[in-house]
């Protein structure tokens, strides 16, 4: 009987040694987890560093050779709206001046000064010089641009309207919902006016 009692006591002692020590003080075991690294959102579209709403973009035609407008097209993509002014294939292209102007001076016809209706709240005026939309030879007039004088817009552009073809200056106005940064570039006989979404 004494030997049996001793065996039972040893069994209880071993059971006590095998218990979880982490619960000896009554505290629950602590678990830690590592949160996944946060994802930084990078915008799909960013305006180029030279884009601006306040800076006038201009280029002079040093040869003073008249350039003839042949087309206006839309080259927009998901990040920007583009208005392409196409000319006959001649270098270096017309002189141009592109800048935002108040409605009082933007929405008028060159020469006559008559008001021109243009949709939008901000107006980017594109002046091309020396440039024309037709070749004149005596009584003969051959139009090089036969498209519309008013084109529907896309994205932030409300519409594009011709406001002048007078004394070697061709003027178009791009109406916007507000002023957007823009850049200009001459490429492949086209003046590209690029308006970035921002």
Where are these regions (language model features)?
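C-terminal motif of bacterial Sec signal peptides marking the signal peptidase cleavage site
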Residues: 13-16
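Hydrophobic helical h-region of N-terminal Sec-dependent signal peptides
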Residues: 6-11
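Short linear recognition/processing motifs and adjacent strand/loop elements at protein termini
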Residues: 18-198
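Bacterial N-terminal signal peptides that target proteins for export
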Residues: 1-5
């Amino acid at each position: 009987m004494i030997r049996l009692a001793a065996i039972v006591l040893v069994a209880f002692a071993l059971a006590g040694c095998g218990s979880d020590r982490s619960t000896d003080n009554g505290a629950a075991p602590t678990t830690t987890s590592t949160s996944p690294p946060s994802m930084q959102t990078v915008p799909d579209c960013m305006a180029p560093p030279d884009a601006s709403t306040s800076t006038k973009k201009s280029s002079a035609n040093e040869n003073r050779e008249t350039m003839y407008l042949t087309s206006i097209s839309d080259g927009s993509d998901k990040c920007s709206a583009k208005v392409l002014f196409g000319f006959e294939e001649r270098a270096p292209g017309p002189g141009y001046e592109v800048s935002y102007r108040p409605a009082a001076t933007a929405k008028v016809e060159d020469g006559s000064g008559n008001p021109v209706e243009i949709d939008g709240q901000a107006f980017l005026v594109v002046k091309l010089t020396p440039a024309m939309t037709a070749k004149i030879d005596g009584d003969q007039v051959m139009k090089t641009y036969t498209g519309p004088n008013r084109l529907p817009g896309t994205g932030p552009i409300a519409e594009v309207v011709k406001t002048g073809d007078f004394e070697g200056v061709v003027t178009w106005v791009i109406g916007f919902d507000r002023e957007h940064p823009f850049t200009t570039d001459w490429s492949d006989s086209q003046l590209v006016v690029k308006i970035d979404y921002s």
